[in-house]
From Swiss-Prot:
Its EC number is 5.3.1.6. This is Ribose-5-phosphate isomerase A. It catalyses: aldehydo-D-ribose 5-phosphate = D-ribulose 5-phosphate. Keywords: Isomerase. Catalyzes the reversible conversion of ribose-5-phosphate to ribulose 5-phosphate. The gene is rpiA.
Amino acid sequence: MTQDEMKKAAGWAALKYVEKGSIVGVGTGSTVNHFIDALGTIKDEIKGAVSSSIASTAKLEALGIRVYDCNDVSELDIYVDGADEINPERDMIKGGGAALTREKIVAAIAKKFVCIVDGTKAVDVLGNFPLPVEVIPMARSYVARELVKLGGDPVYREGVITDNGNVILDVYNMKITHPKDLESKINGIAGVVTVGLFAHRGADVVITGTPQGAKIEE
């Protein structure tokens, strides 16, 4: 089974958590694209979706799924999204696709976060994947200096502007043993919009695509 086939297995398995008549929170990325395809097969059974990115919105609308503004929805039953890394405590690094802030907002209004990944994303300690930080452009240099003080090596992600008009710093060489503490510290730096650590709001369900199919941990 290829990596993409494992992603597909995880994405389609998440359909079991979609309630009839509900509005579904939808993340961003290659694994989520498989979930969106799956969602398209039951589009007449759901009310619609709240999307975490312009890219996911376009894909949802192309399949005829109504996309609601996050401001018009007070609560979601589920939010389905991938991760760049996930540890045994279900803390995650997200933001490889630069949609981390909107992902964090949609996750915040969801009762249940269903994380869909392939087996390569599971780690014991977060930090091998560079940690994305969304930053207001004028604060980029200042935030980078502060991230160095926290032990990281920040690199400006050239040519990338987020859906919110901001820039991304990818922080390398961080062994993240206390994800909640680090999330709070980085979010406290002036000019940071958010960090791609999802520890205060981790996953509730993890669906992992494996060569044997989807493995579900609740």
